[in-house]
């Protein structure tokens, strides 16, 4: 169905097309999708102690304002992450700010945390009970004088309605946000988050979303701090500010974060590096180029326990979860695997 309309959709400005997709989901205009593997035990797993049907999640960025998370569960996603949400409403960067690189199966975006703000998003979620496992991705306002406190505001606002909260320190589109990968700043942030959780008497799982553009020494430092603070999981990784050399589309030099297929190989390498350092004590959610059973399989082999996608759905359409599960099942059956968790971390570089 999607393939028939793809060429027409791709003639529309990417951000406009995205807004139309949100409206369609909000109005339940998407087709009923058949998924013969919906209840297949091969994909059953737990995330933060809660049963989910499969390990395929919707990444933050698609449903920024928590408008359609229940519709996304209907599309088959095992979990959904909304946001990024900032304390105050924020327009983001000037348009155009999203670019579709069709030949490269990639997007470049410089949206800049455009969202309605934590109060509006919180009210929306409280009035529309989530029907699946819901994560909320939080970040600071662009012009904030106290970005550390912005994260704490997000934690206070959402700790009692989310199944987990993601601390986003990795978007390339908010100036100096990635400075939180610095050892001292990251440790300070994690300490404040821990203290705030104690004040709130909250056991909300904390996830940290990592940049792909970090050095090996930073990976080691971050892993040490993540283990010290007993973070529940990490997301590897966000969009990259680089990696443009092999792209074919004329838009490849647009400023912003690159997502999709060109990110896959580097993301998998980064997952492996974190997997070896975290030693199964912190789970990894793998992101970057997930659009098929094969690409999900590679993430699990590298060390991810779950995967997320966004760009893949832009190019493959709303049936992508069913497609991935069908293809992944064929691979696992061929290899004699009964549940995907058996292969997590089984392929590491020498």
Locate each region found by the language model.
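An N-cap/entry alpha-helix motif that binds or orients negatively charged groups
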Residues: 2-45, 109-114
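Conserved, mostly hydrophobic/aromatic
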Residues: 13, 58, 80, 121, ...
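Glycine/Thr-rich beta-alpha phosphate-binding loop at enzyme active sites
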Residues: 22, 26-29, 33-38, 172-185, ...
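Short beta-strand/loop segments at the ligand-binding rim of alpha/beta enzyme cores
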Residues: 51-57, 130-138, 199-212, 276-286
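Catalytic cores of alpha/beta
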Residues: 65-72, 152, 214-228, 276-280, ...
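Glycine-rich phosphate-binding active-site loops on the catalytic face of alpha/beta enzymes
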Residues: 78-90, 169-171, 233-242, 289, ...
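A gly/proline- and charged-residue-enriched helix-loop-helix capping module
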Residues: 83, 88-133
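C-terminal helical cap(s) of enzyme catalytic domains, especially alpha/beta-barrels
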Residues: 89-105, 243-259, 313-337
């Amino acid at each position: 169905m999607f393939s028939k309309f793809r060429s027409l959709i791709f003639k529309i400005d990417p951000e406009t097309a995205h807004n139309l997709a949100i409206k369609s989901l909000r109005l339940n205009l998407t087709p009923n999708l058949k998924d013969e593997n919906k209840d297949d035990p091969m994909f059953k797993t737990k995330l933060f102690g809660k049963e989910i049907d499969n390990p395929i999640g919707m990444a933050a960025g698609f449903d920024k304002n928590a408008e359609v998370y229940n519709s996304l569960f209907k599309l088959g996603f095992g979990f959904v992450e909304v946001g990024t949400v900032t304390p105050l409403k924020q327009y983001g960067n000037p348009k155009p700010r999203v670019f579709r690189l069709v030949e490269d199966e990639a997007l470049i975006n410089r949206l800049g945390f455009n969202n309605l703000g934590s109060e509006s998003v919180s009210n929306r979620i409280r009035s529309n009970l989530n029907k699946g496992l819901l994560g909320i991705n939080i970040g600071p306002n662009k012009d904030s004088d106290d970005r550390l406190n912005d994260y704490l505001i997000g934690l206070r606002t959402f700790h009692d309605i989310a199944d987990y909260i993601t601390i986003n320190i990795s978007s390339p589109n908010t100036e100096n946000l990635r400075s939180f990968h610095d050892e001292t700043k990251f440790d300070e942030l994690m300490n404040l988050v821990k203290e705030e959780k104690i004040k709130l008497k909250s056991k909300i799982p904390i996830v940290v979303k990592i940049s792909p553009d970090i050095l090996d020494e930073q990976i080691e430092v971050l892993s040490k701090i993540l283990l010290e603070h007993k973070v529940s999981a990490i997301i590897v990784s966000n969009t990259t500010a680089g990696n443009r050399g092999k792209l074919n589309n004329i838009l490849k030099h647009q400023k912003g974060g690159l997502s999709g297929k060109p990110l896959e190989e580097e993301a998998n390498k980064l997952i492996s590096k974190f997997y070896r350092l975290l030693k199964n004590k912190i789970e990894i959610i793998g992101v970057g180029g997930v659009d098929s059973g094969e690409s999900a399989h590679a993430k699990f082999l590298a060390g991810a326990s779950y995967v997320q996608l966004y760009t893949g759905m832009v190019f493959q359409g709303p049936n992508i979860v069913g497609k991935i599960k069908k293809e992944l099942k064929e691979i696992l059956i061929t290899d004699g695997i009964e549940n995907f968790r058996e292969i997590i971390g089984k392929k590491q570089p020498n």
